Curated annotation (Swiss-Prot):
Keywords: DNA-binding, Nucleus, Transcription, Transcription regulation
GO cellular component, one term: nucleus
UniProt name for this protein: Regulatory protein zeste
Biased composition (Acidic residues): 213-232
Residue spans of biased composition, Gly residues class: 153-162
Gene name linked to the record: z
Molecular function GO terms recorded: DNA binding
PANTHER family: CYSTEINE AND GLYCINE-RICH PROTEIN 2 BINDING PROTEIN, IPT_TIG DOMAIN-CONTAINING PROTEIN
Organism of this sequence: Drosophila virilis
InterPro entries reported in the protein's UniProt record: Myb_DNA-bind_5
């Protein structure tokens, strides 16, 4: 069924020529139907179908099939039975009253029940199926013959009183029109039935029941049994019967409308009386239980009440309240949904070292870069050590030359021996220079070895770390530092014999000479040996200390960061606490305002009540 109403229902069974129905509404609310096409045989069979007479024969194509017999119309008694049944099950079958949770199965069950009740009723002359009854329901609601309800009912009942305004004379005129039209259309073996009470509601305020979609009323046409006969005489007889039934039905409807108007007026009077009695009872109750507004206060409420107190306008009120700390503040205090996290507060146990390293050096270093840095640092440490050694050796040579010159001045007599001493000293100097060159060569070789070792270590560590992240972690530290610090101590065994050799030579060679130079030389050489030993010890200590220092530095950093983390956690908790306290203040304020508002409402109502009492007493 389409939402256009019942008008096209008859044409649905396959007739090819569609009838155009023009409805003209006269002043008195009557309807005259003119056919748009003169040869609309069989189309309009169901068009005017007023009281929903359930003609399930449908219209067939004109010459191919004979006409099916019309089922007899509903009598007035049957209509009353159906109206009462509809009224009983109205909440389910009526679209206006149907709730969303009602599914179509419950609707279908109620329709089945209506059909059963109707067919089992004693006043029913012929059995009807669900399709016919549903069609009657639709048509009767379209023509506003149902629902006959008093003013109490909701929905489309507002315009029902107007139905009775159609006068009996208008009905008689319409019946005459019907008879004429039916006599004309008997030539086409068809009948157009026009209803007296079909009235389009002129008010836009009441929404037309005609405009309701019929899809919501589930129709199942499975059990419509079509009988094939073509007795034309039987059809003409049925049409005459229908005319008589129509006249009887129109009279019955007019009577029913008058009765119903009287009933609705009586019911409205009764309702007014009841509502007045209820109002009086309420007023007396209020007088006995007088509310003392001043005794109400927001302070008496407990914390739980406040927490459970969440009115609908909670947020709007909060926006109007100023922040408690700022007397002049106008900004709105928003509470972020997620607590803001500090960057260091995200450290977990697993990624802790990583986070510390990136905190100390914000740029992340790959392993190769780190090893290159370490290598440069080691070379930088070696260079000043070499420079010191060279400077000390030069100083020693100058001191020896000075001492030799002094000895030569004292021992001019022993010129030959002095010359021999000078020659020996030159030889010693040459030997020392050779030794120095050898030392430098050895140091260069050591540096090359160090570089090779460091490269090998780097390759090994890279092989280990290829599976992991390229960023630097603590696990690489001890291996790299060991690789750099171990070779630093290598010059120790080499330098000891080198420095000891000239001392032995000088002791041997100068022993025959004067006592003064030999003592001075021995002291100088002892000082040199002590200085070199101190340097070596310092280098060893530096190598060991640098590793320990680094570890200690990282430990200190870690402790500092842990401390920072705890401080941040406590700060976050403090912030949360402050927020919660602020929220509580807001809740209290909101609640106080709400209570004040309710007090005002109660006062207003009390004043209105007093005025009403005065009015009623006067």
């Amino acid at each position: 069924m389409s939402a256009a109403g019942d008008a096209g229902a008859g044409a649905a069974n396959g007739s090819n020529n569609v009838a155009v129905v023009q409805a003209t509404v006269s002043v008195s609310g009557n309807i005259s139907v003119g056919d748009g096409s003169p040869n609309n045989n069989n189309n309009n069979n169901a068009n005017g179908n007023t009281n929903g007479n359930s003609n399930n024969n449908g219209s067939t194509a004109g010459s191919s099939k004979g006409q099916l017999p019309l089922t007899p119309r509903f009598t007035a008694e049957e209509k009353d039975v159906l109206y009462t049944l509809f009224h009983l099950h109205e909440e389910v079958i009526d679209i206006k009253h149907r709730k969303k949770q009602r599914n179509k199965y419950s609707v279908r069950d109620t329709w089945d029940k209506i059909v059963r009740d109707f067919n089992s009723h004693p006043h029913v002359s012929a059995m009807r199926n669900i399709k016919q009854i549903q069609k009657f329901w639709l048509n009767s609601r379209l023509r506003k013959q149902y629902p006959y309800r008093d003013g109490s009912a909701s929905g489309g009942s507002a315009g029902l009183g107007k139905v009775g305004t159609v006068s009996a004379s208008a009905q008689q005129q319409q019946q005459q029109q019907q008879q004429q039209q039916q006599q004309q259309q008997q030539q086409h073996h068809d009948s157009v039935k026009v209803e007296p009470e079909y009235q389009i509601s002129p008010e836009a305020s009441e929404h037309n029941p005609q405009g309701e979609p019929f899809d919501e009323i589930e129709m199942d046409g499975n059990d419509v049994s079509e009988m094939e006969d073509d007795p034309l005489e039987a059809q003409q007889q049925q049409q005459q019967q229908q005319q008589q039934q129509q006249q009887a039905a129109a009279q019955a409807q007019a009577e029913a409308q008058q009765q119903q108007q009287q009933q609705s007026a009586v019911a409205e009077m009764q309702k007014l009386q009841v509502s007045a009695a209820v109002a009086a009872a309420n007023a007396s109750m209020l007088n006995t239980h007088r509310i003392n507004v001043d005794s109400i206060s927001a302070e008496k409420l407990t914390l739980n009440d406040l927490l459970h107190f969440k009115p609908a306008r909670h947020d709007e009120i909060i926006l109007q309240i100023k922040h408690p700390t700022d007397a002049t503040a106008t900004q709105i205090h928003t509470i972020p949904a997620q607590p803001q996290q500090h960057t260091m507060a995200t450290i977990t146990a697993g990624g802790y070292n990583q986070q510390i390293i990136s905190e100390i050096k914000p740029q992340q270093i790959t392993l190769a870069q780190y090893q290159a840095q370490q290598h440069q640092q080691a070379q930088a440490r070696l260079r000043p050590g070499q420079a010191q050694q060279l400077a000390q050796q030069q100083l020693a040579a100058q001191q020896q030359q000075l001492a030799v010159a002094a000895a030569a001045a004292h021992q001019q007599q022993n010129s030959s021996s002095a010359a021999a001493v000078v020659v020996q000293q030159h030889q010693q100097q040459q030997q020392q220079q050779q030794h120095q060159q050898q030392q430098q060569q050895q140091q260069v070789q050591q540096q090359q070895q160090q570089q090779q070792q460091a490269a090998a270590a780097a390759a090994a560590v890279k092989m280990q770390l290829t599976g992991g992240t390229p960023t630097f972690t603590f696990s690489a530290l001890p291996t790299v530092t060991a690789a750099t610090s171990v070779p630093v101590t290598v010059p120790v065994p080499v330098t000891v014999p080198v420095t000891a050799a000239p001392a032995a030579v000088s002791n041997v060679s100068v022993s025959g000479a004067g006592t003064l130079p030999t003592g001075a030389q021995q002291q100088l050489q002892l000082q040199q040996q002590q200085q070199q030993q101190q340097q070596q010890q310092q280098q060893q200590q530096q190598a060991g200390d640098s590793y320990e220092e680094r570890i200690n530095y990282f430990k200190v950093k870690e402790a500092e960061l842990r401390c920072k983390e705890q401080q941040l956690a406590t700060e976050a908790k403090k912030i949360e606490l402050n927020k919660a306290q602020d929220e509580l203040k807001y809740m209290r304020e909101v609640h106080r305002l709400r209570v004040e508002e309710l007090k005002m409402k109660i006062r207003i109502l009390q004043k209105e009540e007093e005025q009403l009492q005065k009015c009623s007493s006067t």
